[in-house]
Amino acid sequence: TKTEEGEFISEGGGVR
């Protein structure tokens, strides 16, 4: 999954 900012995050994580 990727954020709108284009950074990768794990599912159910949300770590930036």
Swiss-Prot record:
The keyword Nucleotide-binding does not apply. Its main location: secreted. It comes from the Eukaryota. Transmembrane segments: none annotated. One of its GO terms (biological process) is adaptive immune response. It is found in: Secreted. Keywords: Adaptive immunity, Blood coagulation, Coiled coil, Disulfide bond, Hemostasis, Immunity, Innate immunity, Secreted. One of its GO terms (cellular component) is extracellular region. The keyword tRNA processing does not apply. Conversion of fibrinogen to fibrin is triggered by thrombin, which cleaves fibrinopeptides A and B from alpha and beta chains, and thus exposes the N-terminal polymerization sites responsible for the formation of the soft clot. The soft clot is converted into the hard clot by factor XIIIA which catalyzes the epsilon-(gamma-glutamyl)lysine cross-linking between gamma chains (stronger) and between alpha chains (weaker) of different monomers. Heterohexamer; disulfide linked. Contains 2 sets of 3 non-identical chains (alpha, beta and gamma). The 2 heterotrimers are in head to head conformation with the N-termini in a small central domain. A long coiled coil structure formed by 3 polypeptide chains connects the central nodule to the C-terminal domains (distal nodules). The long C-terminal ends of the alpha chains fold back, contributing a fourth strand to the coiled coil structure. Cleaved by the protease thrombin to yield monomers which, together with fibrinogen beta (FGB) and fibrinogen gamma (FGG), polymerize to form an insoluble fibrin matrix. Fibrin has a major function in hemostasis as one of the primary components of blood clots. In addition, functions during the early stages of wound repair to stabilize the lesion and guide cell migration during re-epithelialization. Was originally thought to be essential for platelet aggregation, based on in vitro studies using anticoagulated blood. This is Fibrinogen alpha chain. It comes from Equus asinus. The gene is FGA.
